[in-house]
């Protein structure tokens, strides 16, 4: 009987201890499930998609680069005055164009006495005024070709995302420097080959053969300006061609180059 009583006491104390522990130790809180990596990735994607709805697409640049003869002979018969007026009209029209897909940029290279950047390549809408060309000096066209090639190949000025550039060459005379090598280097450069190249011969003394070699658009052969009015007509055609590209679904697509007819009531003497 003594041993049985001893076992009973041990069992009683063990059961009592268990009961006391169950009342003292609080129940542990349920563990929260850890988010899976896939859930976190989905959340990030959803946030990025929401931000894209509010992002504004940056228009791609469409460079228009003019190489203008400003030599002494351009000061005759109001040629330089007509050129100045036509340039201002073109840049002003470009500045008002929509920039939804393409942003027109304008750069002006002059060659008269020396070749120089008259207007660095800038967005047309940011041009507040174009200083007038002054006629004087000889015709260093080769140096102008070098400047144009360097500008075209400058990836900081004309990034790879830019639309096809427009190159415009106009002259009323013959180059008087070593121009053939720079001319070939420009025309054979990768970007110049892809560019739309337009040319205008002003007056009877222009180097028509060289200007024809420069122009590469079968739809826009060399334009011959016989008077000041023709200079305006040429640049209006340039303006229409470029602005039509900016409004199209694909501004890289070439557009028709149509020179408007002369005004019947406008009297103008030939150069």
Predicted segments with their positions:
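VWA/integrin I-like adhesion module and closely mimicked acidic/polar interface patches used
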Residues: 173-217
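Short glycine-/polar-rich loops that comprise or flank the Walker A/P-loop
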Residues: 61-62, 164, 193-196, 217-220
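Short beta-strand-loop
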Residues: 3, 102-132, 208-216
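Extended acidic, low-complexity intrinsically disordered regions
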Residues: 33, 203, 228, 250-271
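Von Willebrand factor A/integrin I-like adhesion domains
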Residues: 204-252
